[in-house]
C-alpha cells in the first residue's frame, strides 16, 4: 500500500512548515533494513519462555549464560554490523542536514540512525553496539561481545550486560524524550505500533499540547485518532516519494 498524493502533499506541508521536528521511530523503521521485528507474530522469538522473561533484567541476574544465549538468538547479535541504513533513515538525516532541528526518539537498538548521519538521536531502549559491566561500569564494544559466548568484563571478570533497556528496567531517557516532543513543531511517528509503554504516551501528550502529529506505519494503531495524518504504507517508499 502506498500513500496517496493528497496524503503526501499534506505531509510535505507539515514537514516544510516545521523547523523543530521530533521523530519517534519503532521496529518498522528497521525492518526495511532486513532486521526482523522480534515482537511480531512471525518475529524472532517462538520459544517456550515468554519474550518478556527471556530479555528481562531478572533473567540476566539469575542466569547470565542462559540470558546471553537467548539474547543472541532474539537480536541476531552476530549480524548486527551487517545491516545498513535504509531510505527512511537517510531521509531523516537529510532533513537534519537541510537545516531543520530534527530530534529522533528511537525505540530501536541497532544504531542505524547514527550510521545514516543523524546527530540528535535519543536511543530510548539503549543500543546493541556496546555492553557494560554492571559492577565496574567498564564499557565493551560489539566486536568483543560477538567473540564470546558469555562476555565477561576485561577489567573485573563479571558477566557483561548489554546496553539495552531490559524488561523490568526503567527507560532512563523518557523524560527527555517527552520534553523533546513537547518542544517540537511537528511530531512524526514512523514504524511504531505504539504498543510499548511509556513511549506510546509521547504522541498522546503531544496531541494534547496541540502539536501536529503524523504517523507512517504499515498497520493501524490504537492511537490513530490522535493524529492529524495517518499513512498506512512503507516508510522507505513514502520517504522516496517525499523527496521526489
From Swiss-Prot:
Classify the main location: cytoplasm
Name of the molecule in the record: NAD-dependent protein deacetylase
Establish whether keyword NAD is in the entry: yes
Q: Which NCBIfam families match?
A: PRK00481.1-4
Q: Per UniProt, which keywords does this protein have? A: Cytoplasm, Metal-binding, NAD, Transferase, Zinc
The entry's localization annotation reads: Cytoplasm
User: Transmembrane ranges?
Assistant: none
Q: What is its EC number?
A: 2.3.1.286
Q: Which domain of life is it from?
A: Bacteria
- Protein family per UniProt: Belongs to the sirtuin family. Class U subfamily.
| Role | NAD-dependent protein deacetylase which modulates the activities of several enzymes which are inactive in their acetylated form.
Q: Which GO molecular function, any one, fits this protein according to its record? A: histone deacetylase activity, NAD-dependent
Instruction: Show where the Deacetylase sirtuin-type domain sits.
Output: 1-244
Catalytic residues identified in the record: 125
Q: How is the cofactor bound?
A: Binds 1 zinc ion per subunit.
Q: Which organism is it from?
A: Chromobacterium violaceum (strain ATCC 12472 / DSM 30191 / JCM 1249 / CCUG 213 / NBRC 12614 / NCIMB 9131 / NCTC 9757 / MK)
Residues binding Zn(2+): 133, 136, 153, 156
Report the GO terms under cellular component. Answer: cytoplasm
- UniProt catalytic activity: N(6)-acetyl-L-lysyl-[protein] + NAD(+) + H2O = 2''-O-acetyl-ADP-D-ribose + nicotinamide + L-lysyl-[protein]
What is the taxonomic lineage of the source species? Bacteria, Pseudomonadati, Pseudomonadota, Betaproteobacteria, Neisseriales
Locate the residues binding nicotinamide. 38, 109-110
Q: Which gene encodes it?
A: cobB
Positions annotated to bind NAD(+): 27, 31, 38-39, 107, 109-110, 125, 192-193, 217, 235
Name its co-factor(s). Answer: Zn(2+)
Amino acid at each position: 500500500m502506498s500513500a496517496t498524493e493528497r496524503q503526501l502533499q499534506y505531509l510535505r506541508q507539515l514537514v516544510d512548515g516545521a523547523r523543530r521536528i521530533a521523530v519517534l521511530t519503532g521496529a518498522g523503521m528497521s525492518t526495511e533494513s532486513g532486521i526482523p521485528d522480534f515482537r511480531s507474530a512471525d518475529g524472532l522469538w517462538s520459544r517456550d519462555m515468554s519474550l518478556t522473561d527471556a530479555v528481562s533484567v531478572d533473567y540476566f541476574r539469575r542466569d547470565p549464560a542462559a540470558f546471553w544465549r537467548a539474547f543472541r538468538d532474539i537480536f541476531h547479535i552476530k549480524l548486527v554490523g551487517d545491516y545498513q541504513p535504509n531510505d527512511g533513515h537517510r531521509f531523516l538525516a537529510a532533513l537534519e542536514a537541510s537545516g531543520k532541528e530534527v530530534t529522533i526518539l528511537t525505540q530501536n537498538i541497532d544504531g542505524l540512525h547514527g550510521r545514516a548521519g543523524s546527530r540528535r538521536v535519543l536511543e530510548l531502549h539503549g543500543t546493541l553496539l556496546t555492553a557494560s559491566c554492571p559492577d565496574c561500569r567498564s564499557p565493551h564494544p560489539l566486536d568483543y561481545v560477538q567473540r564470546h559466548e558469555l562476555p565477561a568484563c576485561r577489567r573485573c571478570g563479571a558477566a557483561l550486560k548489554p546496553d539495552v533497556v531490559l524488561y523490568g528496567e526503567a527507560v532512563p531517557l523518557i523524560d527527555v524524550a517527552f520534553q523533546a516532543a513537547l518542544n517540537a513543531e511537528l511530531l512524526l511517528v514512523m514504524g511504531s505500533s505504539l504498543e510499548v509503554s511509556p513511549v506510546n504516551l509521547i504522541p498522546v501528550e503531544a496531541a494534547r499540547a496541540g502539536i501536529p502529529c503524523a504517523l507512517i506505519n504499515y498497520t493501524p494503531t490504537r492511537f490513530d485518532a490522535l493524529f492529524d495524518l495517518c499513512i498506512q504504507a512503507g516508510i522507505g517508499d513514502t520517504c522516496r516519494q517525499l523527496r521526489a
